[in-house]
Amino acid sequence: MSIATISRQVRHALPDIGPEPTRTATRTPSRDHLRAVPTRTTTAFHGVPRTVSENLGVPTLHRTVVDYANFDHAASTPALESVKAAVDVALRTYSSVHRGSGYASRITSGWYEEARAQVHEFVGAREEDLVIFTRNSTDSLNLLARSLPKSTTTFVFESEHHAALLAWNPSRTVRIPVPASVQDALILLEDALRRAAATTTGRRLVVVSGASNVTGELWPIKSIVSIANRYDARVVLDAAQLAPHRKIDIEALGVDYVAFSGHKLYAPFGAGVLAGRADWLNDAAPYLRGGGAAGEVTREQTVWSQGAARHEG
């Protein structure tokens, strides 16, 4: 049974998302109530998925409780009730992944790989692309940074999120000034790549966020890819902010890698993805040495796994 099938079953088992009783007037809570995590009864909206924190109340200095309004989605989204229910179903047969031959382990390993296949489809990856599970977007970008060929020069705008700005080898990184406009960004990028092509050799990688976590501005990914291709540069798309709002299609966009986090897509914290071309990842030293990263270990040598297992540990 696939995760998708389980999710559908869970959704059917959930109560209908209909209107709930209108919230009552603000009242003064007891001292014991303030010590606990308060909850509220609010009005639900038709067609809007429920989150685990939608009835959260916030105690005020005036000893009242007000509804919690989440304006922090760019940092982390609340988990969906359907996600919570699906996790609960999966936990009933949870066991080790690819580390056992027992019944529960085989079920969990199957779901794990089914989830990988679904992510592969979700991001529109090429057939030969790898999908590697990580902790979050920052972890994904650091994994790629550790996997770059030694001669790689990285190009990154100074306006990038710290995860995309700081992961790379400083001595091999070209920082592009904050652009004044979209057109300015394209001009600055091409100028940086042109100068590098005239003075250096080796691989090149352009790092770009699909959407700004500060302004919400959408970047012209296809135009950036077009410029990068002229200088034989690869492109990694930091889609942490883009994935929750726009369809991600690696093949259609022409990017080489994409990184994003589950906790910005209504899942709990602790899951991320790096998807993209396999060659650099298969040639690199394992990101996490041990566990499934080792295909064979003898006194004389260690043979590292290929594919996603090489870096998932």
Report the location of each language-model feature.
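Pyridoxal 5′-phosphate
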Residues: 2-23, 27-313
